A protein has these predicted regions:
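Oxidoreductase cofactor-interface core, primarily capturing Rossmann-like NAD(P)-dependent enzymes
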Residues: 1-46, 61-72, 76-93, 100-109, ...
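Rossmann-fold cofactor-recognition segment
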Residues: 48-62
Length: 182
């Protein structure tokens, strides 16, 4: 078991992180190190019961040494950045620093969950920093001395139930998603 490669998963208790941890554990080819700000949380303990190793690794600026420790000994790392409020977004800096910590720890391969660069695509007409900042982090990771893979996922269906709760109006199902008219 000690020869089995370790994959560290940042944001392991998030929707995406939990899915990655569970999939890797089910595959059985890797040991999974689940990075979370609170290893004592119910969600983290659930991952531990499934076979993940829990380590402290908060997705917040100033956790650089914590990240290096969490990534140490891992062959690869799955990284996410949490969406942050548009004003004062530090997602780009956070993503770069997490990736740098993985490289400093000796990780050989980074998998990063990214999105499209909306600023570039629209010539700056549409403001979507949670997309653009992730794309900029992917560009940064591409320049690091490690192998890298980037995944772009669709909208999470569960977000409909949490943020855009469907409702019935006049006999029609309405999904209150904010989209431009064009």
């Amino acid at each position: 078991m000690l020869d089995t490669p370790v994959i560290a998963v940042a944001g392991a208790t998030s929707k995406q992180g939990r899915s990655v941890v569970r999939s890797l554990l089910r595959g059985g080819d890797y040991r999974v190190r689940a990075m979370t700000r609170d290893p004592a949380s119910q969600m983290a303990k659930s991952l531990e019961r499934q076979g993940a190793e829990l380590v402290t690794g908060s997705l917040s600026l100033g956790s650089d040494d914590e990240w290096v420790d969490a990534f140490s000994g891992a062959r690869a790392a799955f990284l996410i950045t949490p969406p942050t409020p548009p004003k004062g977004s530090r997602e780009y800096e956070l993503g770069c620093r997490i990736a740098d910590a993985a490289v400093r720890a000796g990780v050989e391969h980074i998998v990063f969950s990214t999105l499209e660069n909306v600023d570039k695509i629209t010539g700056g007409r549409i403001f979507a920093p949670h997309f653009t900042d992730k794309a900029r982090v992917a560009d940064y990771i591409s320049g690091l001395p490690v192998a890298s893979t980037f995944v772009i996922l669709s909208f999470f269906y569960t977000n409909l139930m949490e943020y855009y709760v469907p409702r019935v109006e006049d006999g029609s199902l309405v999904l209150p998603i904010y989209l431009p008219e064009d």
